[in-house]
C-alpha cells in the first residue's frame, strides 16, 4: 500500500470529525516562529481563483506553507467518488488547467493537474455512503 494512502485516510477522518464537531465559523491558527497557517472552514486565500469548487463542497482542514509554496485543503462532497472525479475532469480544463493524469478505482482516485502558476494533485476517496472527501494540494511553480 502506498504510504500516501494511510496518511490521506487519517487526514480525511480528522477533517470530517473536526468539521462535524466545529461550529460554522472559520478558524485559522499560525504557529509562533513559523509562517505555516492552519485553518478550517474557508477556502485559503492562496487557492487559485480559477480552481472549481462545487457549491455543495465543504472546506474542512486547510494549510498554507508559504516557505515551501504549498497550499492544502480537504473538501467533502455529498457525492460518490466517481461523481466528484467527473466534476473535476469536466471543470478543470475549461478553467485553464491541464490534467496530466487521472486514475483510480470506484472508491479512490488521483488527479494530477497544472496551470501556468501551480502544479496540483487531488486524491478523492469515498468517505461513506454517498460522501466523498478530497485532499487537494497546490504547489507554486
What is the meaning of each model-derived region?
Residues 2-9, 14-17, 22-141:
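An acidic-aromatic pocket/loop used at catalytic or ligand-binding sites
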Amino acid at each position: 500500500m502506498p504510504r500516501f494512502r494511510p496518511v490521506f485516510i487519517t487526514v480525511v477522518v480528522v477533517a470530517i470529525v473536526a468539521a462535524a464537531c466545529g461550529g460554522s465559523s472559520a478558524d485559522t491558527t499560525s504557529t509562533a516562529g513559523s509562517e505555516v497557517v492552519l485553518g478550517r472552514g474557508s477556502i485559503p486565500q492562496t487557492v487559485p481563483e480559477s480552481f472549481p469548487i462545487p457549491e455543495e463542497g465543504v472546506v474542512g482542514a486547510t494549510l498554507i506553507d508559504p516557505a515551501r509554496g504549498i497550499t492544502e485543503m480537504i473538501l467533502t462532497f455529498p457525492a460518490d467518488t466517481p461523481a466528484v472525479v467527473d466534476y473535476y475532469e469536466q471543470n478543470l480544463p475549461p478553467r485553464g488547467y491541464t490534467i496530466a493524469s487521472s486514475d483510480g478505482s470506484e472508491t479512490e482516485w488521483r488527479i494530477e493537474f497544472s496551470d501556468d502558476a501551480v502544479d496540483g494533485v487531488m486524491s478523492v476517496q469515498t468517505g461513506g455512503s454517498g460522501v466523498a472527501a478530497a485532499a487537494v494540494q497546490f504547489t507554486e511553480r
